[in-house]
């Protein structure tokens, strides 16, 4: 059993503001849909390997909700909750849900000529729980004689572009972004007892639409 704590240095009478007032109520929602990937999020998918899985032909759809936790000149931090529907009936594993709670760090790229936002990129880290173990994880782990777990580490990579650069600023899509999200579940190389000592996981490549509200 372990216990811990944190302490943030600051002025009690003048608390540090982590969000600028004009963005204090900022929230967002996202929908995404995609396919089971063959490669791993690190060193394969992030290097351009977008092949479909050779282990199982499945799809995933999801919706997520985010709250801005901290904004900055270069990076914003958001807290996110996501619900995914796994479509694995054709592979004999049925259809089921998984859930993720995580934090994302989001950066932005700007045009050198106009200082307008051109794209966003983000990395998310948290935990995932699935109602069933995805079929790809079952098959990969069985081939190695390893454990499976419904509760695993969650990683996410996202790259998208502001739709206001395509549509008029008066459009309902002016606060929306379209792009690609990579969804990943894994056991952190079999180094975690709480995750069942699972080594390996599963990845999905999805297209998404994300829109801000309240800013």
Located regions from the model:
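Residues that define the transmembrane beta-barrel architecture of outer-membrane proteins
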Residues: 1, 25, 55-61, 93-101, ...
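Transmembrane beta-strands of outer-membrane beta-barrel pores
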Residues: 7-9, 33-39, 67, 81-89, ...
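Short loop/turn motifs that connect adjacent beta-strands in outer-membrane beta-barrel proteins
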Residues: 12-27, 68-77, 109-120, 164-178, ...
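Extracellular loop and loop/strand-boundary signature of outer-membrane beta-barrel proteins
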Residues: 46-52, 86-93, 141-146, 192-196
């Amino acid at each position: 059993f372990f216990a811990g704590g944190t302490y943030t240095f600051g002025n009690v009478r003048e608390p540090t503001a982590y969000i600028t007032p004009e963005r204090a109520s900022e929230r967002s929602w996202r929908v995404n849909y995609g396919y089971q990937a063959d490669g791993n999020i690190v060193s394969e998918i992030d290097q351009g390997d977008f092949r479909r899985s050779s282990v199982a032909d499945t799809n995933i759809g999801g919706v997520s909700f985010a709250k801005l936790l901290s904004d900055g000149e270069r990076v914003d931090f958001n807290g996110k909750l996501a619900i995914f529907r796994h479509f694995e009936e054709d592979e004999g594993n049925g259809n089921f849900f998984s859930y993720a709670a995580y934090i994302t760090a989001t950066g932005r790229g700007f045009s050198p000529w106009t200082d307008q936002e051109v794209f966003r990129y983000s990395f998310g880290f948290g935990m995932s729980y699935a109602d069933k173990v995805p079929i790809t994880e079952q098959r990969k782990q069985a081939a190695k004689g390893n454990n499976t777990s419904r509760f695993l580490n969650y990683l996410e990579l996202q790259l998208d572009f502001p739709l206001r650069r395509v549509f008029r600023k008066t459009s309902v899509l002016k606060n929306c972004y379209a792009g690609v999200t990579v969804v990943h579940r894994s056991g952190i190389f079999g180094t975690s007892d709480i995750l069942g000592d699972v080594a390996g996981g599963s990845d999905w490549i999805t297209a998404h639409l994300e829109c801000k509200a309240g800013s």
